[in-house]
Amino acid sequence: MNSQSSRNETAATAVNGSDSAAASRDHKSGGGVLKRLKSRRNQVDRRPVTEEELRALGRDITPDEVLGLRAVARDYLCKLEDNIYNIDFTRFKIRDLETGTVLFEIAKPPHCDLDEEDDENRDADTSAGRFVRYQFTPAFLKLRTVGATVEFTVGDQPVTNFRMIERHYFQDRLLKSFDFDFGFCIPNSRNTCEHIYEFPQLPEDLIRLMIEHPYETRSDSFYFVDNKLIMHNKADYAYNGGQ
């Protein structure tokens, strides 16, 4: 996250573990390969767009369109059933890449099947499984490089050009936009990758405000397959842990 203008809102060069020989890969302890992905560089400015304008389109939303958003979305821009590929995130871990310290980790219990009543409750709650609240200590805002490892499964269909755009805001001020390419995922596969977040130094006055106003730092994570929005997750953040 940083306080740059939207003209410089993205981080380092795109590294696609599936499609590029330059991708960083490590072997996981349980076998298989861990792909490390960096955000795209050199995004150009997009025409500013509002959430209301995107809702009025009446068609699939594209990556270029969400890159025009200048404020956090108040609601979700797609439905749960738009995830026709049955992409399911099963594990998530955040660590400081400089020290290896794990800062946050959560995993979905195995064989976590919803019964009929749970399905009804999920239908009633549009944020079910799509919202996360984080609480970190103030020291998190001093970190320079953070790795976020995600493990996910896909259903019976191949997933092509899987992409995530994640935009962070503080009090509706755009702090940082990340843009990651997952690449191609074969049907019925389990996939693991680590997104590399590179954070420039934040101004001290902005750090103070972010600590003093917990959960006013928010993010939208938009997931696309073949340039069509299929998933939208949200999060908010507090940096006053331990105080």
Swiss-Prot record:
Listed name of the protein: Protein unc-119 homolog B
Disulfide-bond pairs as recorded: none
InterPro entries: Ig_E-set, PDE6D_unc-119_myristoyl-bd, PDED_dom, PDED_dom_sf
Keywords annotated in UniProt: Cell projection, Cilium, Cilium biogenesis/degradation, Lipid-binding, Protein transport, Transport
Region (Disordered): 1-49
Entry keyword annotation includes Hydrolase: no
Binding site for tetradecanoate: 134
Annotated gene: unc119b
Organism of origin: Danio rerio (Zebrafish)
Source organism, top-level taxon: Eukaryota
Free-text note regarding domains: Adopts an immunoglobulin-like beta-sandwich fold forming a hydrophobic cavity that capture N-terminally myristoylated target peptides. Phe residues within the hydrophobic beta sandwich are required for myristate binding.
Family affiliation: Belongs to the PDE6D/unc-119 family.
Compartments reported by the entry: Cell projection, Cilium
Transmembrane residue ranges: none
Organ and tissue specificity: Detected in embryo. Detected in larvae four days after fertilization, in retina and neural tissues (at protein level). Detected in embryos at the sphere stage, during gastrulation, somitogenesis and in swimming larvae, both within and outside of the developing nervous system. Detected in adults.
GO annotation, biological process: cilium assembly; Kupffer's vesicle development; lipoprotein transport; nervous system development
UniProt main location, coarse: other
GO cellular component: a single term: cilium
Record's function text: Myristoyl-binding protein that acts as a cargo adapter: specifically binds the myristoyl moiety of a subset of N-terminally myristoylated proteins and is required for their localization. Plays a key role in localization of proteins to the primary cilium membrane.
Any one GO molecular-function label of the UniProt entry: lipid binding
